[in-house]
Amino acid sequence: LQKAAGEGYAAEVFLTAERTMEGIGFTIEGRADGIFTDEDGTVVIDEIKTTAAPTDAITEDMNPCHWAQGMVYGAICAEQRELETLDVRLTYYQIDTDEIIRYTRHFSAAELDAFLNDLLRQYLPWARRQLDWVEARNRSLGALQFPFPAYRPGQRALAGEVYRACAAGKAEQKGGTRLFCQAPTGIGKTMSALFPALKAMGEGKGEKIFYLTARNTTQAAAEDALARLRAADPALSLRSVTLSAKEKAC
């Protein structure tokens, strides 16, 4: 649909905006499927949805979230281009019949701006809880101690390298900070990786840690390491989840 739209149709347009509400900063971003100017000179936000719903079920009000997405993109676009009005169009493609159904609504920039602000206002309570949680988590990670009386030979050096890699963050010219380690069995590699990574996250050097394993035994080792950290510090504020392959879960 995007390729067939013509030369004046800009596909996959990245949109981003910064808003502050009650002291909390928000970054809103996404990709509009298409933006173009119609024959009347009106800018149109085109949101394309693929659906298997029967044709008679593809109504203008089939899914309010589809309009909401287009309206948020419209609010950002209107702000960036200093537009007074624009159109939001929903384009539905029925995969079984190849039928294309379109609906268009006209909005003022003021309407779209008010809509976006109302969404953020509804989101505020969750944002506050999230900020409070991150503050409590980082505070507890700052007080976290190594859960063993002493490091094993080579373990402190490995943990130090992991911490430095995490603390360095991304180096754009190198595609990010990478650390490749090789160590013998029994050195305590799992704790040597998790503990310093958690300490770095507690200092604001990261938001999440992904620990990827190829075997069930190494997955269990990571879970055991987290359990040991929690046992050593019952006040630790830390959330973790284990994701397994669908083939293993079924």
Positions of the model-derived regions?
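Acidic-basic catalytic patches of nuclease active cores, encompassing PD-(D/E)XK
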Residues: L1-R19
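Mg2+/Mn2+-dependent nuclease catalytic core
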Residues: A17-D113
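Short glycine-/polar-rich loops that comprise or flank the Walker A/P-loop
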Residues: E84-L86, K205-E207, L236-R239
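Polybasic (Lys/Arg-rich)
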Residues: E111-A143
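Conserved pre-motif I regulatory segment
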Residues: W133-Q182
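Walker A/P-loop NTP-binding motif
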Residues: Y163-A167, T190-K205, A225-L229
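Walker A/P-loop
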Residues: A168-P196, E207-I209
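Conserved Walker A/P-loop ATP-binding site and its immediately adjacent core
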Residues: K208-R228, V241-A249
